[in-house]
């Protein structure tokens, strides 16, 4: 049911309930407060198109038999002139459910709505004027992005698109942890490679990174190459093996550039890259710590500075500043989130791995301790579980590129069908291979709830049949494009007249099911935004593709009867648009040919 029709029906039922209350209880309509009307689609098609339980909600307070009350509501609704054209019939079922049958015209109205709104169909402005910051990926610049980062990128970008579909002003942000111990390990790893050492050699640092990418960084540093991240200044390799700081700067810039390339291949863009190091350079960390001290939220013990996190629900107080003067890792996180609040983002969503669960209470407690009006649940967190990669029936745990894990780029190349010799050499890959791999990876990685573990089956991603969910959905779009092109060619037709086509021939069971699924798209997006659940879009697209394939397999489209043919083409054109709109939300292409 379209949102406009749903709102109309909810209003009608609310008014009718008030009328029934007045007639049976003698209570004035103005004084009677009707419960919120909830409309749901019955699980069994034979039970109608919409179900409502308002009679059972009111039975006790009105001291009425729920079935009798439901019948009174049904009679009053069907007698209301405003219900004509929207409701075809209604009946009472079970203990007092009201099952409604919508008119054929109201079901078919979704096609006109799709044609009128096109790419905007499904979108809403209900959250217009509200700003939200979505932080995701936020990888250390110490290596290529791994598949966990890929899941974050797919979730974060899709979630941002879902929120934007409801009118939110969405700000995508990547937080670079470029000031920790890992950066020091990156520098000594690159230095060791520059000295000609490799993993396993005497003198190879114990904490070093072993991936082949370290050798690439060292080579370019020695050759005096220049690298830069998308938002950074160019850094030239100094070539001095002894200058560890120069090596560090070059290695960080090199890997930030590599991560930029990974994200570009994945089709993900950010509005801002925020560097942890800037928090120290600008004195933000010290400022936040001093504010917490001034607020009386800290104490000193055994030479360390502690934060009273138990005041805000943590299981124990936490060390902020160690006895050697260095800060624990969650302190800059508190400072960083204070900047989010100060920048005007009253709604913030962090997408992180489930291994970050322990930091949530600490960060929130630190923000509460500042006493600047930040809500207790700030920020929101969406934690995702790990991704296991399967290829050729075996779990893949390492790659040559990274040394100890599978990278996002590995996954894109494998899922795109890269042949041996192309892997780890993106310049050898054609755009179609990258697109196919990107589509598969993005669709797969949001096709499960974030808090469930996910097995990424590369072999499944390569299949071109109904077993592969992204192929199944994209093929529905391509199949429709093919049919419409054939219609244009065979009958000399064009799509300009489709918005005014007579839709009354769309009265079959399969056509009706497809129409109803199309009408669910706007509410699905609203639900996905409210629940921070982008996987709902993937679920919906699979269901929509299924309804289309069922319709197409049951009913021939290019029939001799012109009215029936044009009505079915209009249905297909609307389905094509909604498939494209949904795929765009999750960052997946809608190919016209496959």
UniProtKB/Swiss-Prot annotation:
**Motif interval(s): 'HIGH' region:** 139-149
Q: Where in the cell is it found?
A: Cytoplasm
The protein's GO terms of the molecular function aspect are:
arginine-tRNA ligase activity; ATP binding
Q: Does the keyword ATP-binding apply?
A: yes
Could you state one GO biological process linked to this protein? Answer: arginyl-tRNA aminoacylation
Cite a GO CC annotation. cytoplasm
EC number(s) per entry: 6.1.1.19
Q: Which UniProt keywords apply?
A: Aminoacyl-tRNA synthetase, ATP-binding, Cytoplasm, Ligase, Nucleotide-binding, Protein biosynthesis
- Taxonomy, superkingdom: Bacteria
Q: Which reaction does it catalyse?
A: tRNA(Arg) + L-arginine + ATP = L-arginyl-tRNA(Arg) + AMP + diphosphate
| UniProt key word Ribonucleoprotein | no
Family annotation (InterPro entries) = aa-tRNA-synth_I_CS, Arg-tRNA-ligase, Arg-tRNA-synth_N, Arg-tRNA-synth_N_sf, ArgRS_core, DALR_anticod-bd, Rossmann-like_a/b/a_fold, tRNAsynth_Ia_anticodon-bd
Q: How does it assemble?
A: Monomer.
| Xref: NCBIfam families | argS (TIGR00456)
Q: Which family does it belong to?
A: Belongs to the class-I aminoacyl-tRNA synthetase family.
PANTHER family reported in the protein's UniProt record: ARGININE--TRNA LIGASE, CYTOPLASMIC, ARGINYL-TRNA SYNTHETASE
Protein name per UniProt? Arginine--tRNA ligase
The gene name reads: argS
């Amino acid at each position: 049911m379209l949102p406009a029709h749903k709102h109309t029906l909810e209003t009608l039922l609310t008014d009718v309930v008030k009328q029934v209350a007045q007639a049976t209880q003698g209570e004035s309509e103005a004084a009677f407060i009707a419960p919120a009307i909830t409309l749901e689609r019955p699980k069994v098609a034979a039970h109608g198109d919409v179900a409502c339980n308002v009679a059972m909600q009111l039975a006790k307070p009105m001291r009425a038999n729920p079935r009798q009350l439901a019948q009174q509501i049904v009679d009053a609704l069907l007698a209301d002139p405003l219900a004509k054209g929207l409701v075809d019939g209604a009946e009472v079922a079970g203990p007092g459910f009201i099952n409604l049958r919508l008119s054929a015209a109201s079901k078919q109205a979704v096609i006109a709505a799709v044609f009128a709104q096109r790419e905007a169909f499904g979108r809403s402005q209900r959250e217009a004027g509200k700003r939200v910051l979505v932080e995701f990926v936020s990888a250390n610049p110490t290596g290529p992005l791994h598949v966990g980062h890929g899941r974050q990128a797919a979730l974060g970008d899709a979630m941002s698109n879902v929120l934007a579909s409801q009118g939110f002003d969405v700000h995508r942000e990547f937080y670079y942890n470029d000031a920790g111990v890992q950066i020091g390990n990156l520098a000594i790893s690159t230095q060791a490679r520059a000295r000609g050492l490799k993993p396993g050699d005497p003198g190879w640092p114990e904490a070093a990174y072993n991936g082949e990418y370290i050798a690439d960084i060292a080579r370019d540093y020695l050759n005096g190459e220049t690298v830069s991240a998308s938002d950074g200044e160019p850094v030239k390799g100094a070539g001095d093996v002894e200058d560890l700081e120069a090596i560090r700067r070059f290695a960080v810039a090199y890997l930030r550039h590599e991560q930029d390339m990974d994200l570009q291949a994945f089709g993900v863009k950010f509005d801002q890259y925020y560097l942890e190091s800037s928090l120290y350079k600008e004195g933000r960390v010290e400022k936040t710590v001093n504010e917490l001290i001034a607020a009386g939220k800290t104490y000193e013990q055994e030479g360390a500075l502690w934060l009273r996190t138990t005041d805000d629900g943590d299981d124990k107080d936490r060390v902020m500043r160690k006895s050697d003067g260095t800060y624990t890792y969650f302190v800059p996180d508190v400072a960083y989130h204070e900047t989010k609040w100060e920048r005007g983002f009253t709604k913030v969503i962090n997408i992180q791995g489930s291994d970050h669960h322990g930091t949530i209470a600490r960060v929130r407690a630190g923000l509460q301790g500042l006493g600047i009006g930040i809500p207790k649940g700030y920020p929101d967190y969406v934690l995702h579980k790990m991704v296991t990669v399967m290829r050729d029936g075996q779990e893949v745990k390492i790659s040559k590129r990274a040394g100890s894990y599978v990278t996002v780029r590995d996954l894109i190349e494998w899922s795109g069908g890269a042949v041996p010799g192309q892997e780890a050499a993106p310049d050898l890959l054609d755009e179609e291979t990258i697109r196919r791999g990107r589509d598969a990876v993005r669709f797969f990685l949001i096709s499960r709830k974030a808090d469930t573990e996910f097995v990424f089956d590369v072999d499944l991603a390569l299949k071109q049949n109904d077993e592969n969910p992204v192929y199944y959905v994209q093929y529905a779009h391509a199949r429709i494009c093919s049919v419409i092109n054939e219609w244009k060619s065979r009958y000399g037709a064009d799509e300009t007249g489709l918005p005014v086509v007579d839709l009354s021939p769309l009265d079959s069971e399969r056509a009706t099911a497809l129409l109803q699924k199309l009408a669910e798209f706007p509410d699905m997006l609203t639900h996905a935004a409210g629940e921070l659940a982008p996987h709902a879009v993937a679920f919906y697209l699979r269901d929509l593709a299924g309804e289309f394939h069922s319709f197409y397999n049951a009913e021939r489209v290019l029939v001799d009867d012109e009215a029936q043919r044009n009505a079915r083409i209009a249905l297909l054109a609307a389905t094509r648009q909604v498939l494209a709109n949904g795929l765009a939300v999750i960052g997946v292409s809608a190919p016209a040919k496959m």
